[in-house]
């Protein structure tokens, strides 16, 4: 029988993630307002944008549909102008849908992590970038079952000190991601634990690492065209 998230290690990771978001949000709402979390120490304001890019040169190996191309949810953080009086972006993209979906996937009530949806970042969506300076670019790649914004605090600290950071959810290898229509895509959804073990044995070392490299290369090539 095939169940969603049969990978027990991933279940533990996601459960800890939900508990962490829940705990941080509850503690934060009592000890300090969620919109006044200490900002990064650098001198630059932080802008961020989310994109959905499709690599039409690569078929999606995680699905059996031959017309399915590799689609990535991408986020960029960059030094920006102003930003002090603008509404900050949520810590997790699509927080309500993301947290409720993960909660249900690990067997918790859908509204369990609702406090986590209140967490905000120190970035402002769509803020005007600084164009008269040059900044080093950092590529961030999450771990197995991770998320592109799992290290948002560290990313924002870097950006506030003059870096640009770009990251993507490695689709089907991230715990959760979204397509351009806002539909959720889970970690190897509908693959049983036995099937996952065989899948990992066949593909993980040789294919998955190379596929991640191709994801990041695609980000760089697309970024040049933006």
Question: Could you describe each region identified by the protein language model?
Answer:
Residues 172, 178-226:
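Alpha/beta-hydrolase active-site loop
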Residues 2-13:
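Bacterial N-terminal signal peptides that target proteins for export
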Residues 44, 69, 151, 209, ...:
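A structural signal for well-ordered alpha-helical scaffolds and beta->alpha junctions
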Residues 28-138:
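Domain-level recognition of soluble alpha/beta enzyme cores
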Residues 76, 158, 216:
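Divalent metal-coordination and catalytic microenvironments
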Residues 120-135, 140-178:
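Short substrate-entry loop that stabilizes the transition state in hydrolases
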Residues 12-20:
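Sec-dependent N-terminal signal peptides
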């Amino acid at each position: 029988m095939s169940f969603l998230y049969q990978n027990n290690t991933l279940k533990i990771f996601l459960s800890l993630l939900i508990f962490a978001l829940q705990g941080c949000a509850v503690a934060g709402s009592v000890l300090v307002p969620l919109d006044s979390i200490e900002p990064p120490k650098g001198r630059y304001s932080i802008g961020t944008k989310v994109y959905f890019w499709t690599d039409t040169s690569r078929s999606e190996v995680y699905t059996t549909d031959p017309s399915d191309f590799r689609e990535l949810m991408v986020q960029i953080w960059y030094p920006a102008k102003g930003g002090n009086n603008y509404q900050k972006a949520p810590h997790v993209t699509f927080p309500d849908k993301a947290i409720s979906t993960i909660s249900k996937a690990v067997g918790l009530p859908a509204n369990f992590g609702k406090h986590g949806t209140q967490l905000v970042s120190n970035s402002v969506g769509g803020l005007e970038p600084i164009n008269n300076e040059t900044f080093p670019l950092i590529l961030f790649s999450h771990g197995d079952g991770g998320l592109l914004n799992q290290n948002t605090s560290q990313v924002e600290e870097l950006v506030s000190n003059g870096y640009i950071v770009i990251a993507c959810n490695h689709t089907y290898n991230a715990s959760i991601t979204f397509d351009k229509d806002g539909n959720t895509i889970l970690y190897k959804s509908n693959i049983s634990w036995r099937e996952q073990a065989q899948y990992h044995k066949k593909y993980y070392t040789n294919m998955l690492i190379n596929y991640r490299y191709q994801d990041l290369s695609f980000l760089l090539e697309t970024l040049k065209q933006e």
